[in-house]
A protein has these predicted regions:
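Short acidic/glycine-rich loops and adjacent helix/strand connectors
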Residues: 1-183
Length: 183
């Protein structure tokens, strides 16, 4: 494996189109965030009282090329400089996920680079360790995101044990609704 890798990741699981470019700093070291660009659809969906999946996917399709260009410009790279392309593989809105995955796969194919699908919930569980690789393991993780509420025993990357989950309404859903009510 090379000393460092430049990674472009696409997030399109719901109503935000996001692209981040990171450069790894080697084993056990925090990566450098070269760029992180987000295009929010909050104003679009607010008119409908919540996220409309078809609108979300159409807006991802419209926004993603510009968000990728902006992320590359801010990072000072071109798609040819990227070593690995990734995208949120799920869970999320199916059509929205397809937009992000298709785009990342097309870029990977066009540049001859690998593509990696990332589990959205695993991303949430591991995000606190972006700046502190390895972090305290094992630890208890809680994911409160949209329709998901999970309590997870995190043993390491890819090594998780589900301890519990909501059975009906998710805490993430309540969190989102309260946030919407507060503006």
């Amino acid at each position: 494996m090379p000393e460092s890798l430049t990674v472009l990741g696409i997030e399109s699981s719901c109503d935000e189109t996001a692209v981040a470019i990171l450069r790894s700093a080697g084993e056990g070291k925090a990566p450098e965030i070269l760029s992180s660009i987000i295009s929010s659809q909050i104003a679009i969906h607010r008119r409908h009282g919540g996220v409309v999946p078809e609108l979300a996917s159409r807006n991802h399709s419209a926004d993603l090329p510009g968000v990728i260009r902006a992320a590359c410009r801010e990072a000072g790279v071109t798609p040819a400089d990227i070593d690995v392309f990734g995208a949120t593989g799920g869970p999320g809105l199916v059509a929205a996920l397809l937009v992000g995955n298709s785009t990342a796969k097309a870029l990977a194919l066009a540049t001859g680079k690998p593509f990696v699908s990332v589990n959205h919930l695993e991303g949430h569980l591991l995000s606190p360790f972006l700046k502190r690789p390895g972090g305290p393991v094992p630890h208890l993780g809680m994911v409160v995101s949209g329709g998901h509420t999970l309590f997870v025993d995190v043993r390491g990357v890819g090594d998780y044990r589900l301890l519990g989950r909501s059975l009906d309404d998710a805490a993430g859903e309540a969190f989102d609704k309260v946030g919407k009510m507060l503006g």
